[in-house]
Design a protein with these regions (language model features):
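Short, non-helical or kinked segments that cap or interrupt transmembrane helices
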Residues: 26-45, 88-101, 180, 224-238, ...
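Alpha-helical transmembrane segments within multi-pass membrane transporters and channels
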Residues: 59-106, 265
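Helix-loop-helix "hairpin" substructures at the membrane interface of multi-pass membrane proteins
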Residues: 151-228, 256
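Cytosolic-side transmembrane-helix boundaries in multi-pass membrane proteins
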Residues: 186-193, 197-200, 271-319
Length: 319
């Protein structure tokens, strides 16, 4: 049971922070299907920086890891500007823009990974190999049966994500910026009439989404494979979008959806081990979160609390 909780959290929390990014963007009124590409590009930037500076630190130093997280967030937010440019400046279809960003990220990072490995590191590889992240166990509280597993063998990024998620919740629901952002997704003309720049608020929301997606991407790179490669694009971004939809674009219910996906995945892996199934069944287990997504769509698709102006191109002159 403990291993299911430990592994489930290490999958659910990066997914959760990516979903929060999607909530920020869609609450502002901009459809965000580019989470997959943003997390991949952010992970690419973070992994490259981590490998480039690793030689300046001892093998067990956590500094490259934390710098990688920062740079992944920066990389994701910068790459998100493409989506912002297409949607806000050129008023492109937001769904198509998201798909384009995803495809561009996949192709660009695959090419640049090989190029940088050859030019910078003198290697013929299609991946950046990362160091294995250390884990943290919180003394005392980790001894509590079942609940203690939440505080056992934590990746450092799990604590970072919890802190960032709390800040994101506070900003969204307890600040004027969050109020204006939510209003942009429901009635952008009212926001404009109040003297606020709808375009600037939506730009900020898109960049926040990019930063949080990039953070989630580098966390997946460290926890799942300890490297960056094209295998980072396996649908985690779309799973984050599904989670925020099931959470009705609210942060706390979205956390519940992410935990459900995480525990379904880790529980499936544990089941394979307990039943001593062939290792090939582990690949089958990877589809459990997506099967769960389809089932939830069947039962909860009618409970849609999306922002009223989501996906609607804002025209200041139209009323």
């Amino acid at each position: 049971m403990d291993i299911v909780i430990i592994d489930g959290l290490s999958f659910a929390l990066p997914l959760f922070i990516m979903a929060i990014g999607g909530i920020y963007c869609e609450k502002s009124g901009v459809t965000m299907l580019a989470v997959e590409g943003l997390q991949g590009f952010g992970a690419f930037i973070g992994a490259f920086v981590a490998v480039a500076i690793a030689g300046n630190f001892s093998g067990d130093s956590p500094v490259p890891f934390y710098i990688a997280m920062i740079m992944a967030a920066v990389g994701g937010s910068i790459f998100a500007l493409i989506h912002a440019l297409l949607c806000l400046k050129f008023k492109a279809n937001q769904v198509i823009s998201g798909v384009v960003v995803n495809i561009l990220a996949m192709a660009l990072t695959a090419y640049l990974t090989k190029l940088l490995n050859r030019v910078v590191f003198g290697a013929t590889s299609d991946k950046f190999v990362l160091t294995v992240s250390s884990r943290i166990t919180i003394p005392g509280i980790s001894k509590i049966p079942v609940l203690g597993a939440v505080f056992t063998n934590l990746y450092p990024f799990e604590l970072v994500i919890v802190a960032v998620a709390f800040i994101a919740w506070f900003v969204m629901y307890k600040t004027r910026f969050g109020m204006h952002l939510r209003a942009c997704g429901d009635n952008p003309h009212a926001v404009d009439a109040a003297g606020r720049q709808v375009g600037q608020i939506r730009l900020a929301a898109i960049m926040i989404c990019g930063a949080l997606s990039g953070l989630g991407g580098i966390c997946f790179a460290y926890s799942i494979s300890a490297n960056f490669s094209s295998s980072i694009y396996v649908g985690y971004g779309y799973l984050a979008i599904a989670a925020l939809i099931f959470g009705n674009w609210r942060i706390l219910p979205t956390l519940g959806a992410c935990l459900l996906f995480g525990f379904a995945r880790s529980g499936g892996y544990r089941l394979v081990q307990v039943l001593q199934m062939p290792s090939s069944y582990q690949d089958l287990v990877m589809i459990l979160p997506y099967v769960l997504t389809l089932l939830l769509l069947v039962f909860f698709s009618k409970q849609n609390g999306s922002p009223r102006a989501l996906g609607v191109i804002y025209d200041k002159g139209a009323r």
